[in-house]
């Protein structure tokens, strides 16, 4: 069984290396400090994410730095065993960082210009929704909208930080702003 566990660990660790290497390259390009997510995003031995410990470690580490690049999608147990979030887990890491630094806004850059009024595979030229509430976002996710990883919402909502979903390929687009309430 040790061989199977080792093979599984290597597969998980290897799947995180793309994010790790991209983070290294981006940090070097920007001249920012690289912070390995394995050092600041904590999981328990059973693979359960530990939000409280992560926020403590991440907040302390980022308080020391003016600028940092932190890869998404993975973290580690206390003994250094790499653990990954599910697909789209980089959204979660971004949300955790926004919470840790008490950001005014969490911008989540993706390949679409926010949440759309209709499925673009069915309705051509679907328009994006400019502003929605967290409650409306939850309802959209129940209907299959999957622009943002569901676990990325809680840390920023808890901290009162709005989310802006933006399109990397069309940065001029407004995207969708996700807030607690849209009116008084």
Where are these regions (language model features)?
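C-terminal catalytic "cap/lid" subdomain
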Residues: 15-184
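Single conserved hydrophobic/aromatic residue that forms the stacking wall/gate
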Residues: 1-12
């Amino acid at each position: 069984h040790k061989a199977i566990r080792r093979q599984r660990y290597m597969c998980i660790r290897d799947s995180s290396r793309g994010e790790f290497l991209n983070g290294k390259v981006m940090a070097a390009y920007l001249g920012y400090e690289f912070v390995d997510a394995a050092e600041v995003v904590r999981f328990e031995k059973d693979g359960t994410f530990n939000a409280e410990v992560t926020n403590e470690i991440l907040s302390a580490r980022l308080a020391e730095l003016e600028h940092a690049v932190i890869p998404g999608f993975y973290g580690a147990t206390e003994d250094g065993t790499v653990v990954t979030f599910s697909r789209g887990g980089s959204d979660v890491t971004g949300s955790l960082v926004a919470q840790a630094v008490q950001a005014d806004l969490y911008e989540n850059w993706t390949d679409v210009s926010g949440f759309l009024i209709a499925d673009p595979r069915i309705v051509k030229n679907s328009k994006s929704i400019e502003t929605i509430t967290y409650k409306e976002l939850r309802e959209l996710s129940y209907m299959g909208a999957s622009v943002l990883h569901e676990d990325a919402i809680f840390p920023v909502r808890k901290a009162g930080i709005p989310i802006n979903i933006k399109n990397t390929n069309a940065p001029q687009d407004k995207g969708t702003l996700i807030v607690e309430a849209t009116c008084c």
